[in-house]
Design a protein with these regions (language model features):
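Terminal, non-globular segments
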Residues: 1-192
Length: 192
């Protein structure tokens, strides 16, 4: 496991997926099918999340439609068969949406812990999640400022809790920042 962090200094990704893959390989072996199965199972686990997101937005029919679209998506199929972090990233985004939507309605402690956890997981899974979390953070701060101007104390407190939950998730990533900086100076974006 210690070799993963060192190897990633010469790559362009954070380590979470590779740690999960290492644990997976300890149990199921390192054959091609065994290794790809991790992403496949994560993708299958994302189907109910897609259903829940659609249902939350507009009811059961959209939930079924979104799950079907996800199941038939060539992107989901491709990334569900790759030994890369993209399937995990999709699952985290769907889970994060559900948690954020629930927290906007009623910022309960468990939901806020979930937001912190998923925010941290996103950062530890793929660097581009910083853009997503940054956009969510900006929107939350705009919502907070508007609520303060209107004097809506309940919305101010709820939104401040969401911003704090996002920040706590971001703090979990601080130990990896030196590696991120090293990667940015020595590898850039390896796919470019």
């Amino acid at each position: 496991i210690g070799d993963i962090a060192g190897a990633l200094e010469r790559d362009g990704h954070p380590p979470l997926y590779y740690y999960l893959l290492h644990a997976w390989m300890e149990v199921f072996g390192d054959g091609d099918r065994a290794v790809r199965a991790l992403s496949g199972l994560i993708t299958l686990g994302t189907l109910p999340l897609a259903f829940l997101v659609g249902r939350r937005i507009a009811g059961r029919r959209l939930g079924l439609t979104l799950a079907l679209v996800f199941a038939l998506s060539p992107y989901a199929f491709r990334y569900g068969s790759e030994t890369r972090m993209y399937a995990l990233l999709m699952a985290e985004v769907f889970a994060g949406y559900l948690l954020l939507d629930a927290a906007i309605t009623a910022p309960r402690w468990k939901t806020l812990v979930g937001i912190s956890t998923v925010s941290g997981l996103l950062l530890w899974t793929h660097y581009w999640s910083m853009w997503l979390l940054g956009a969510i953070g900006v929107l939350a701060l705009v919502r907070l400022a508007r609520a303060q101007r209107r004097g809506d104390r309940v919305l101010v407190v709820g939104t401040a809790k969401i911003v704090a939950a996002l920040a706590v998730g971001g703090l979990t990533f601080v130990p990896w920042l030196p590696t991120l900086l090293y990667q940015s100076q020595h590898t850039g974006t390896p796919w470019a």
